[in-house]
């Protein structure tokens, strides 16, 4: 009987030792007012929220967004969305350096269509696309205004379009290379049946003499009697 009561005594002693200690001036929980029931509630509530430094994860960003479907300007790029230094491609060209900042672009966008029309009227059709990257199929950089050299630009060459120094090919030669079959300079224009007019020293052969040479030979062969 004595041995069976020993475990019960140990349990009672352990419960007494493990009971929370209370100060004498501390009130009982059931005696507290409703507003004093949880004095540490203000300190426990922030534990459920993360710091903005660690407020990221699946569907959570390190920055605060107005909406979860809106990106910051730093990440505002993708299909059809490019930042201004990279806003070029098919049909999109980079702007000049003087118009790269946002203030100048806002000023340009505020101009009405009438002012833009007056600005473009000052230039001809060839100069409307006079930009460093404004060239392509049928679009080239423009310098002069003459009709013949309207497309004779630094990049204005291709199929049937050449600069004057490269404007040669089948049936097209520059003046320095404009010779070939049936095409010679005057100093090289000699051959079978072709002699230079002023080079009479080579204009002889079977039945071919100049009139001056024939008269001189006749005078030498015949003497007056």
From Swiss-Prot:
Entries under InterPro entries matching the protein: Allatostatin
Residues that make up the propeptide removed upon maturation: 19-48, 94-127, 141-149, 210-225
GO biological process, one term: neuropeptide signaling pathway
Keywords linked to the UniProt accession: Amidation, Cleavage on pair of basic residues, Neuropeptide, Secreted, Signal
Leader sequence residues: 1-18
Annotated tissue distribution: Highly expressed in the CNS and gut of larvae. Also expressed in the cells of the larval brain and ventral nerve cord and in endocrine cells of the midgut.
GO cellular component: extracellular region
Acidic residues compositional bias, start-end: 214-225
Gene Ontology MF terms: neuropeptide hormone activity
Modified residues annotated as Leucine amide in this record: 58, 79, 90, 137, 159, 170, 181, 192, 206
Pfam families: Allatostatin
Chief place where the protein resides: secreted
Record's subcellular location: Secreted
Family per record: Belongs to the allatostatin family.
Function text: May act as a neurotransmitter or neuromodulator.
Protein name: Helicostatins
Species: Helicoverpa armigera
């Amino acid at each position: 009987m004595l041995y069976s009561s020993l475990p019960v005594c140990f349990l009672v002693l352990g419960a007494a030792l493990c009971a929370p200690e209370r100060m004498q001036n501390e009130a009982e929980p059931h005696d507290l007012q409703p507003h004093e029931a949880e004095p540490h509630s203000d300190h426990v509530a922030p534990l459920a929220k993360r710091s903005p430094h660690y407020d990221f994860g699946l569907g959570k960003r390190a920055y605060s967004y107005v909406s979860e479907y809106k990106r910051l300007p730093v990440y505002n790029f993708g299909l059809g969305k490019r930042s201004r230094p990279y806003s070029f491609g098919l049909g999109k060209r980079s702007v000049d350096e003087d118009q790269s900042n946002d203030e100048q672009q806002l000023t340009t966008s505020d101009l009405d269509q009438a002012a833009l029309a007056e600005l473009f009227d000052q230039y001809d059709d060839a100069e409307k696309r006079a930009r460093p990257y404004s060239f392509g199929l049928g679009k080239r950089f423009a310098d002069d205004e003459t009709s013949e050299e309207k497309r004779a630009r630094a990049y204005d060459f291709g199929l049937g379009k050449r600069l004057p120094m490269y404007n040669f090919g089948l049936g097209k030669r520059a003046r320095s290379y404009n010779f070939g079959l049936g095409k010679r300079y005057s100093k090289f224009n000699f051959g079978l049946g072709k002699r230079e007019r002023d080079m009479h020293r080579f204009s002889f052969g079977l039945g071919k003499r100049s009139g001056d040479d024939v008269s001189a030979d006749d005078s030498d062969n015949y003497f007056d009697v």
